[in-house]
Amino acid sequence: MKTYLAKPNEVPKKWYVIDATGKPLGRLAAKIAVILRGKHKPQFTPNVDTGDYVIVVNAEKVVLTGKKLDKDGYRYHTKYPGGLKFIPYRRLLEKHPEKAIEIAVRGMLPKNRLRDRFMRKLKVYRGPNHPHAAQKPEVLEI
């Protein structure tokens, strides 16, 4: 028996809605990364995009446990000498909570050519409303 390798057009894509209210950021991001990659499907193939679309609502209500709000944060470098920038999660969640989820999910995806394709299938919204009702997304409890 040969190993099954999925083709990109063979795997049906579904839409899921996840409510981030009261969910820890890391656990939420890990579950989202699994769905975006398609690892929850039996047809999973590592080099093919077999994942589903994910809509995250109520991004402003995601939580961080312990002292991570002040101690941890988002680091980036401007490519200039001494250009290491640090934004604490408290400030990031106040101004751009959707970006905090996107950064966490991006870090949990493989660092290859498929990562940008996976990230395009992630839609994050600050409040409870989203414009994707036409896709008939399923509510996914995490």
From Swiss-Prot:
Domain of life the protein comes from: Bacteria
Gene3D superfamilies: Ribosomal protein L13
Keywords, ordered alphabetically: Ribonucleoprotein, Ribosomal protein
InterPro entries according to UniProt: Ribosomal_uL13, Ribosomal_uL13_bac-type, Ribosomal_uL13_sf
Keyword Ribosomal protein belongs to the record: yes
Pfam families xrefs: Ribosomal_L13
GO molecular function: mRNA binding; structural constituent of ribosome
GO terms (BP aspect): negative regulation of translation; translation
A GO cellular component annotation in the UniProt record: cytosolic large ribosomal subunit
Family assignment from sequence similarity: Belongs to the universal ribosomal protein uL13 family.
Subunit field text: Part of the 50S ribosomal subunit.
The protein's role, per its UniProt record: This protein is one of the early assembly proteins of the 50S ribosomal subunit, although it is not seen to bind rRNA by itself. It is important during the early stages of 50S assembly.
HAMAP family associated with the record: Ribosomal_uL13 (MF_01366)
Protein name as catalogued: Large ribosomal subunit protein uL13
UniProt source species: Caldicellulosiruptor saccharolyticus (strain ATCC 43494 / DSM 8903 / Tp8T 6331)
Higher taxonomy: Bacteria, Bacillati, Bacillota, Bacillota incertae sedis, Caldicellulosiruptorales
Gene this protein is translated from: rplM
